[in-house]
Amino acid sequence: MELSDDINQCANLVKQGDHDRYRIIMTLEPKLRSDLFVLMAANIEISRAPWISKENLISEIRLRWWLDAIEEIASKQSVRRHFVTSPLEKILNKSQTKLIKENILARSWDINLEPHLSENELFRYIDATSGNIWAVAAELLGGSQKIGRLLGNAIGVIQYCKASNELIL
C-alpha cells in the first residue's frame, strides 16, 4: 500500500469520525491538508481506544499499542504497519512525539471515568489531550505551538462540556 493510500484512509477516518475537524482541514490549501489529516486520524484512533471495550484491560492494551507505536516513531525504530502510523512517522519530530505520548497517557483517565479531583486536574487533562494535538497541528503548519495549544484548549473545553452533557443525559 502506498503512503498516499494511507493518507486517503486518514482523511476518510477524519471525515467520518470528526466532521468538524474535517471541514476545518478542508479550508486549508491542498498541500497543507495531508499532515493534518494524518495527525487528526491519529487523534481519533487514540481517543477511541479507551472506549472500544467495556473491559478496561482491552482498552489499556489498545492505548499501550499506540504508546509503543509513538515510542517507535520517536526512537526512529521500525514502526509497526498501520494506515495512521506509517504516514505519522514521516511528519512527527521528537518533541511532537512527546506531546502525543502525553495525550495517550492522559487518555487512561477515560478508561476508569473517575471524576477529576480538581479544576486544575481537569484543565491538565484537556491540555494534554486537545491542547497537545493542536500544538502539534500548529507546528506542522509552520505556526507557533503556543497559539495551537490555546486554540486546542478552547476546543477541548467545548468538547468536554459537550461530552459531559451527553454522558449525563
Predicted regions mapped to residue ranges:
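Acidic catalytic motifs of isoprenoid enzymes
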Residues: 1-169
